[in-house]
Amino acid sequence: MLIAPLFLLYDYSFHPPGTRTKEAGLAVAYESGIVCADEVLLHPDPYLTRDEWCVARVAETKRRLEERPGALPTILVNHFPMTREPTTKLRYPEFAQWCGTTRTADWHRRFDARAVVYGHLHIPRTTWEDGVRFEEVSLGYPREWQPRGGPAGLRRIKPEPRAS
C-alpha cells in the first residue's frame, strides 16, 4: 500500500452552475461576493497563475504515481477534493472553483485507490464513488462545529471498511 501525499491545487475547472469558463465563474463569484481569499493572498510564484501551478503539480504527481513500484494500491491524500462530487454540498456553489481540478476525477480508479482523504470543504463525511471510500477529514472552524458539540474527530483509514 502506498500512501501518496499529493499537494495538488485547483484550476477553476469546478465551474459554478451556469458557467463554462474560469472567467465566467470568477465573474459570478465576484458579483455574488463569494470570493476565496486565495485570490488576494495565495501568490502562484514561480508560476504566472494558480491554474498553471495546478497543471504543473498534477503532471508531476501523475508521473510519480504512474511510476509507483509494482502498481501498488494507494491511499490518495490531498488538501482539495479529487472529484467534483463533494462540492455539490457547498452552501455557496460559486466557491467550488477553488476546490480542486477535473484533471484528477478518475485518479481513484486509475491509481487503484483504497481510500481518498481530503479536506478543504469543512464538511466532514464519508462518501463512496465507484466503490472507493472518500473521507473529508477537515476540522473546520469553531463557528462551524460548535453547533454540533465539537469537531468530528479522527477517522480510521486503514483497515478499510467495505461499502454498504
Give short role names for the model-derived ranges.
Residues 1, 27-29, 37-43, 110-116, ...:
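Low-complexity, flexible helical/coil segments
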Residues 1-2, 73-75, 115, 144:
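Structural motif
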Residues 2-5, 134-136:
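Short hydrophobic-aromatic micro-motifs
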Residues 4-75, 82-91:
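Active-site-proximal loop/helix segment associated with metal-binding centers of metalloenzymes
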Residues 7-9, 80, 119-122, 139-141:
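Active-site metal-binding loops of divalent metal-dependent hydrolases
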Residues 15, 43, 79, 108, ...:
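Histidine (H) residue identity feature
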Residues 75-82, 114-124:
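Histidine-centered catalytic micro-motifs
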Residues 88-90, 94-114, 121-164:
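Binuclear metal-dependent phosphoesterase catalytic core
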